[in-house]
Structures are given as C-alpha cells and as structure tokens.
C-alpha cells in the first residue's frame, strides 16, 4: 500500500516556487539602491500618473468636451405605420395603452408614429404624436390623429 500517491505526498516541482527578492536589506543582497539605479525622479519617488516626461500629455493634447446634456429632453418611442398595420389589421381606435398591451412600446414614455410603411385600414390614433408623412398616410386611408 506504500506505492499509492496521497495528497500529503504531493509537492511543487523543483524551481516552481521562488522566494521573492527582499531589497534594501544590506549591501550584500540588493541593498543600497535596491535595483532603482543611482539618481533621479524614479529613484526618489514615483512619477504621477499621466506624466510623459515633459512632453505635452495626452489629456492636454485632446480637445475639451463641448456642449451639455439637456435634462428636459423628451425621448419619444417610435412606431412606424407598418407596425400599426401589422398589429391592428382591422383598423379602429388605437391608444398608447393598446400599443403597450401589444408590446409595441413600453409604458411611461411618449409615443410618436412615423411614416415608414403602407396603411390600408382607417386608424383613429389618440394620445400620440405623428410625423408629417405618417399623418398624411393615415388621413389618406380615412383615419385621424389627436395628440391630447
């Protein structure tokens, strides 16, 4: 039974675990300069992050950020008339709640209808905005749009 390899018999391969070199502990073993060379900034302390040795640093070479983010910007969810024709082929009155129920838009955001696609049925849209092309296509098919 002595030939079976057991956990306590395992040891790392020779040379796999090297001791780290402790510097600055006497002249005989990397003492004095501790591998940092003789004089200069990098011997005495670290250079700050982003320092490029006197060259104009990258963060100063790049232009400043311009403009601002408007906190009052209104983000509309868009629905094309092709999607309306697919979801409501029979036409009729459509509200934002109907679009949410069908999964076309998410709740809590304003909706805008855009004019990509064709309209065959008459839609009465309530509570949505519409682009000029969408408005003309819906009205040409006998529908109407109210934004209130």
Curated annotation (Swiss-Prot):
Disulfide bonds: none annotated. Keywords: Ribonucleoprotein, Ribosomal protein, RNA-binding, rRNA-binding. One of its GO terms (cellular component) is cytosolic large ribosomal subunit. Residues 1-40 have a biased composition (Basic and acidic residues). GO terms for biological process: translation. It comes from the Bacteria. GO terms for molecular function: rRNA binding; structural constituent of ribosome. Residues 1-47 are annotated as: Disordered. Pfam families: Ribosomal_L27A. Binds to the 23S rRNA. Belongs to the universal ribosomal protein uL15 family. NCBIfam families: rplO_bact. This is Large ribosomal subunit protein uL15. The lineage of its organism: Bacteria, Bacillati, Actinomycetota, Actinomycetes, Bifidobacteriales.
